[in-house]
Amino acid sequence: MFRKLFKTFAIVLFLAGSFTGKVISSELTFFTIGTGGTAYTYYPVGGMIANAISKPPGSRECGKGGSCGVDGLIASAVSSRGSVDNVNAILSGLRNSGFAQSDVAYWAYTGTGTMKGKEPAKDLRTIAALFEEHIHL
């Protein structure tokens, strides 16, 4: 599990690197990550990702105890009711990103399953698979 989490952080940091550049203090970018309930796994993982990619103005330099994140980015993990809530929040513009189980993300992309009757979310993208999850009936 640690190996998958490490790979995820590496991917997120790589993707975040495309936003780098010097930032004037007035040029802040806020980035929200929809997670899950605060008592469950996804909320602290979202917090770790947010901390890894954030680098507000005035932060210590990377390598001197500071964040090596994206200059001017302030990311935050936001608790939610889970996958469907996160996908709906992304589609409405309330959140920038969020965790979703693969079946829910697929349904949103295709307009099927729990998202039947809604416009397919063809702009929805997967950044990484964090956990292997099995659904039991």
Predicted regions and their residues:
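Sec-dependent N-terminal signal peptides of Gram-positive bacterial secreted proteins and lipoproteins
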Residues: 10-19
